[in-house]
């Protein structure tokens, strides 16, 4: 279950801190502090708009929370609703490093 939670809150519904130097890849400059990398967000107009509104402070439907792998692996999700939270990682490198350094979190038996 922990690996499933990790995948959900990262690869499906993850955000990464925006870097201004990547704006030249866009048609329009990013005006929020985050980039979307989660496929569940990218594939959903409603999820995308929810993040934009929450990031701009025009909605409080969901929380945007700093990445914490220990919290993520213990946090369940509802796949049939707009997410109530999104975790923001500093960089993709930080995500991969945290996974490698915390492999023991996924070997829990019980």
Locations of the language-model features?
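Core of folded catalytic or high-affinity ligand/protein-binding domains
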Residues: 1-109
